[in-house]
């Protein structure tokens, strides 16, 4: 049965950012601020919106009223195809750490949900004076419980050499500091730790295949022994519990 659970997890498609497969297999608390609701509120009064690292475009596509000008970027090709289906031809293929291919002062709203890398100098450049940045970032130590079970103790975090760049997993002080160094005024910042539960090892496999930075280079074969221990624990003692870290930041140029 363990082999069957691994095989099932290895076969689930993991393109895009639709997490509906996990219903009944895993749970994660949601941040109290409601990013999608805030996004819809800000988008309703915007004239031009850019969604940086849109994933499969699912979040932006859910916004009921979009401004006249909408653009998005995405780096990962499997997500890019899904995003273009969801959003049309407005999605540019852009590496996470690259310059944004848009003119200065082109957008009055720049948004992002769980960006891998944030070029704060580029965010500030493409914003109009008075333009707004709204984003939900992954915080330091997110899902560390699972990462350390699979890989062993993790020390430190990924820090960028460029003071105007941050990566997924940055701490809240580093996030705000980089935004301010780029010339933005931070008007709101919040940070929450959120409980996650995995009800079977299949859900763990799918999660690690989908959220690839949790265990870099993860394959079922390479981590089979750890997965077998985890499978036995869940079968005998119930869900494996981890914690995600989420940060909301809003800033004005």
PLM segments and residue spans:
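A short SAM/SAH-binding and catalytic strip from SAM-dependent methyltransferases
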Residues: 107-122, 136-139
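Conserved Class I S-adenosyl-L-methionine
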Residues: 182-253
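Short beta->alpha connector loops
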Residues: 33, 54-57, 113-119
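N-terminal auxiliary segments of SAM/dcSAM-dependent transferases
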Residues: 1-10
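Class I SAM-dependent methyltransferase SAM/SAH-binding core
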Residues: 47-100
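A short acidic, Gly/Pro-enriched loop at the edge of an enzyme's catalytic core
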Residues: 98-109
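Conserved alpha-helix/loop element of class I SAM-dependent methyltransferases that forms part
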Residues: 14-48, 58-62
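Conserved catalytic/acceptor-binding region of the Class I
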Residues: 120, 130-195, 215-220
């Amino acid at each position: 049965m363990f082999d069957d659970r691994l095989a099932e997890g290895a076969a689930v498609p993991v393109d895009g950012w639709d997490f509906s497969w996990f219903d009944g297999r895993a749970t994660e608390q949601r941040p109290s601020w409601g990013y999608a609701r805030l996004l819809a509120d800000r988008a309703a009064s915007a004239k031009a919106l850019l969604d940086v690292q849109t994933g499969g475009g699912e979040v932006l596509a859910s916004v009921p009223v979009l401004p006249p000008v909408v653009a998005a970027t995405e780096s990962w090709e499997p997500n890019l195809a899904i995003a273009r289906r969801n959003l049309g031809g407005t999605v540019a293929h852009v590496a996470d750490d690259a310059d944004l291919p848009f003119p200065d002062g082109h957008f009055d709203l720049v948004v992002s949900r769980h960006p891998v890398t944030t070029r704060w100098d580029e965010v500030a450049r493409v914003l109009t004076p008075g333009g707004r940045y709204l984003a939900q970032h992954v915080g330091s130590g997110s899902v560390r419980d699972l990462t350390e079970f699979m890989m062993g103790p993790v020390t430190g975090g990924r820090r960028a050499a460029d003071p105007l760049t941050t990566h997924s997993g940055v701490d809240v002080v580093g996030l705000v500091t980089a935004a301010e160094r780029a010339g933005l005024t931070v008007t709101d910042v919040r940070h929450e730790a959120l409980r996650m539960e995995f009800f079977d090892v299949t859900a763990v496999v799918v999660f690690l295949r989908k959220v690839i930075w949790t265990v870099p280079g993860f394959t079922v074969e390479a981590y089979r022994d750890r997965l077998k221990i985890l499978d036995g624990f869940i079968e005998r003692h119930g869900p494996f519990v981890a914690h995600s870290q989420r940060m909301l930041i809003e800033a004005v140029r």
